[in-house]
Amino acid sequence: MRRILFNTAMVLIVASPISYAEEFMNKEQRQATFCGKTFYGKNLINGSTFKIHIDSECKTNTIHFLTGKKAGKTEERKIISMSDEGELCHTSNRDYCNKMKNMGDGTYKGIGTSGRWKDKEYVKLSNIVDGNQL
């Protein structure tokens, strides 16, 4: 019985990082989901909300802040890269990168891979619609 429990535990330990990594969207999935679309976002760390549009070529995102310190302001950020694994990097005074998870309920959560939110789940996106609806 101990051997069965040990083997089961080992399988779970080894498989966990693999399944976790597979939860992130790849480049193709991110482009199909977000490029040429407008959606709502919430910063999970400070609570601010915004509406964002990413152009159809996935080169620029425009953010209109609804609440928080930047409420009422609009910023344009250049997307500087998107890896095949789905890591997207953009500029905002500094370069920030993230990976995105499809939560399966119409929402998406971003995990920082660089910058001040590295390794933190910091953004939730929802209500995706076609075109620029800012």
Regions found by a protein language model. Name each.
Residues 7-15:
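Bacterial N-terminal signal peptides
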Residues 1-4:
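Positively charged n-region of N-terminal signal peptides that target proteins for export
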Residues 18-76, 84-134:
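Lipid interaction determinants
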